[in-house]
Amino acid sequence: MPKMKSHRGAAKRFKKTGTGKLKRAKAFKSHILTKKSPKTKRNLRKGGYVSKSEEKVMKKLLPYL
């Protein structure tokens, strides 16, 4: 059986933490920022984690991560 391939788009966007969670960046912070408050923009700089319901899907996309 051939090797499984990682989804390259997902591999660039997610990193695994020491505890096994998947770390991700937040969306909506690249443009159209004038209408967003400073508090919102500050919170968008922080990272986030993949939810439990999405972890099974991510496991298929990233078998070696």
Swiss-Prot record:
Residue ranges of the region described as Disordered: 1-25
Transmembrane segments: none
Alphabetically ordered keywords of this record: Ribonucleoprotein, Ribosomal protein
GO molecular function, one term: structural constituent of ribosome
Annotated GO CC locations: cytosolic large ribosomal subunit
GO BP, one annotated term: translation
Keyword Ribonucleoprotein: yes
NCBIfam families xrefs: rpmI_bact
Family: Belongs to the bacterial ribosomal protein bL35 family.
HAMAP family, sorted: Ribosomal_bL35
Name of the molecule in the record: Large ribosomal subunit protein bL35
